[in-house]
């Protein structure tokens, strides 16, 4: 009579199934983490699945740094800490850790430890279908989730086309800029020149009430007079400061107006498009892809007095005479000398 075959499994990825296992996911994870093996564990994922009979089943994926040879079919047994009970799993080698991870993810009640080790194999005989992968990525909730799906199921694409994949994911899942919340109420700005208040009334509004060609506003004044906080408190806007960035992460075509702050006039790309509230124009700012700007909204230009900063000084140069004539028809220029809010109040800007 032949001797019973000894248990032996030599694999890098283990797929365990525990029927009728009532131990919590966290306790199971702790017990599996504490198992002593000659090969380091890299990743553990546990899923609790409730069958029709109401009994919880447990699926586990364990990934090792290299192949681990298991000769004890009781090695992965779990022990209840509240009663005298052992839970013995069915033990298999996972031909495709990606497929196993997808399978045990289906119920969503999971816990994991470590970093998943990607492979390019599929139990269906070959690589994952690219269409299946990208359909799953498109149906995911965020760019990060989509990229993780592609990384796990299409590692070759992810490695060789990383730049394009990341760029496409960010475009597909792009979110509008977070609306800015003013730290002070509009009433705090109680020293605003009447011409600026009237400009707001005439030009800053939603698309339905906005003039066909609104006027822009240039405000020049010393630092710490409240220019920026006032300009940003008027409604939904695009705020551009430091350099011209019209990427979708910064610029929204649904804004009511733009604020261009502390950018020297000779560095303002699309000067006329912004100041003239022009419509439907294109931008290809440095290092960015060409984008379509809806336009038709006014712009507030904020600057300090002095060389290289003042729009007034820039436009008064002889070489800019014709540009200055154009600006007079498309913008209102205001110079302030003092704070546009009342000082001394704790709620003042």
Curated annotation (Swiss-Prot):
A biological process term (GO) from this entry: DNA replication
Q: Where in the cell is it found?
A: Host nucleus
Indicate which residues form the motif RCR-1.
15-18
- Annotated active site: 103
- Report the residue ranges where the short sequence motif RCR-3 is annotated in this entry: 103-106
According to its UniProt record, which cofactors does this protein need? Mg(2+); Mn(2+)
Per UniProt, what is one Pfam family of this protein?
Gemini_AL1_M
In terms of superkingdom, the source organism counts as: Viruses
Tell me which EC number(s) this protein carries: 2.7.7.-, 3.1.21.-
Q: Which UniProt keywords apply?
A: ATP-binding, Covalent protein-DNA linkage, DNA replication, DNA-binding, Endonuclease, Helicase, Host nucleus, Host-virus interaction, Hydrolase, Metal-binding, Multifunctional enzyme, Nuclease, Nucleotide-binding, Nucleotidyltransferase, Transferase
Question: Which residue stretches belong to region Oligomerization?
Answer: 156-176
CRESS-DNA virus Rep endonuclease domain: residues covered: 8-116
Q: Name one GO cellular component term.
A: host cell nucleus
Indicate what this protein is called per its UniProt record: Replication-associated protein
State the residue spans of region: Binding to RBR1: 143-153
Q: Which residues take part in binding a divalent metal cation?
A: 49, 57, 59, 107
What exactly does this protein do?
Essential for the replication of viral ssDNA. The closed circular ssDNA genome is first converted to a superhelical dsDNA. Rep binds a specific region at the genome origin of replication. It introduces an endonucleolytic nick within the conserved sequence 5'-TAATATTAC-3' in the intergenic region of the genome present in all geminiviruses, thereby initiating the rolling circle replication (RCR). Following cleavage, binds covalently to the 5'-phosphate of DNA as a tyrosyl ester. The cleavage gives rise to a free 3'-OH that serves as a primer for the cellular DNA polymerase.
Concerning InterPro entries, the annotation shows: CRESS_DNA_REP, Gemini_AL1_CLV, Gemini_AL1_REP, Gemini_AL1_REP_central
Q: Where are the transmembrane segments?
A: none
What is stated about domains?
There are 3 rolling circle replication (RCR) motifs. RCR-2 is probably involved in metal coordination. RCR-3 is required for phosphodiester bond cleavage for initiation of RCR.
Molecular function (Gene Ontology), one example: DNA binding
